[in-house]
């Protein structure tokens, strides 16, 4: 588990908003190659690696996404601040006050800043606490001596430059992990650690399995293509959603029965439940009302597979998120148990 957390820390510090994932993909390629694998880059920019199993006629496909929420420069304002367009689904208040980095395409340089509502100063604006946070009043205050549009553009900053959010990753003495982008870098870290263990211990899985790290999940079309024709089971490893009426918590693995796309495959879900019970893996079944996954994207694209979704319970999703090591352990055990099991009947 220590190595899983180390992978997570390494992943979260790499800026990878959807559409700006080259660095994280290079990290995956190097990490997997150092393990002894032969990773492949997809045309969309994702990374896959295939483990040949005893059954090489029917395959499995397992995914985690390494793209994250982020933003892109929409305009340079007359006062030199930046107007943003969001990447991924989140309300503006979830990034208010967050430090950020502007990745300048023209120069290759980065510039730090902070995302604020225009009416932030409570000594000046009476409506600082009540004004609706919208694209028109949320802005980036750059950490540069700029007071107008010309000075900001002189830095090379232009429309289309990506903006990443400071992850602020912390692991507490009590076992909690606090960070942005636990969705879905926790899952990616879990898959990396399992791949490491399988290689070091020379474990052959019962079924040939493609491990896919996707880079467009947050905008709805992650690992929905390049699925081998032999694949009959598709498992997305992604965060479990917490909140009112939710069963998911920070200490178990969450198995999704339905999200915004509809129900997941019943027999596949029950296969996972049976494994959890047999191996005493703490789990919860849950519904995620406003949610989609790589697996649901694949189904929408026409994949003819059984599909399922599970993951660690993540509190405050798409904000400053939190989970616990207990949930990470349960999720890793669940994925391992599934990959070592027979195909779903």
Residue ranges and their predicted role:
Residues 1-345:
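N-terminal hydrophobic/helix-forming segments and targeting peptides
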């Amino acid at each position: 588990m220590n190595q899983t957390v180390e992978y997570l820390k390494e992943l979260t510090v790499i800026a990878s908003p959807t559409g700006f994932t080259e660095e994280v993909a290079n990290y995956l390629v190097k990490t997997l190659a150092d393990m002894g694998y032969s990773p492949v880059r997809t045309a969309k920019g994702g990374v896959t690696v295939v483990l040949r199993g005893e059954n090489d006629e029917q395959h499995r496909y397992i995914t985690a996404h390494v793209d994250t929420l982020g933003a892109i420069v929409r305009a340079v304002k007359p006062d030199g601040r930046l107007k943003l367009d969001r990447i991924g689904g989140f309300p503006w208040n979830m990034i208010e006050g967050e430090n950020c980095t502007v990745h300048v395409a023209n120069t290759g340089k980065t510039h730090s800043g902070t995302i604020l509502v225009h009416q932030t100063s409570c000594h000046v604006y009476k409506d600082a606490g009540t004004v609706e946070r919208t694209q028109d009043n949320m802005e980036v205050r750059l950490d540069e001596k700029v007071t107008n549009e010309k000075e900001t553009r002189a830095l090379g900053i232009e429309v289309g430059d990506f903006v990443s959010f400071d992850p602020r990753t912390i692991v507490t003495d009590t076992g909690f992990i606090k960070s942005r982008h636990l969705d879905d870098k926790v899952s990616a870290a879990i898959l990396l650690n399992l791949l490491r263990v399988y290689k070091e211990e020379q474990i052959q899985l019962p079924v040939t399995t493609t491990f896919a790290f996707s880079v467009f999940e947050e905008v709805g079309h992650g690992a929905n293509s390049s699925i081998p024709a032999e694949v009959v089971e598709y498992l997305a490893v992604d965060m479990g959603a917490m909140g009112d009426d939710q069963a998911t918590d920070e200490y178990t693995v969450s198995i999704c029965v339905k999200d915004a796309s509809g129900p997941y495959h019943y027999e596949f879900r029950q296969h996972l439940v049976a494994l959890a019970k047999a191996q005493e893996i703490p789990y919860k079944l849950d519904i995620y009302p406003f949610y989609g996954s790589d697996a649901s994207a694949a189904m929408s694209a026409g994949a003819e597979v059984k599909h399922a979704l599970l993951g660690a319970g993540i509190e405050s999703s798409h904000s400053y998120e939190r989970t616990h090591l207990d949930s990470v352990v349960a999720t890793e055990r669940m994925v391992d148990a599934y990959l070592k099991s027979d195909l779903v009947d």
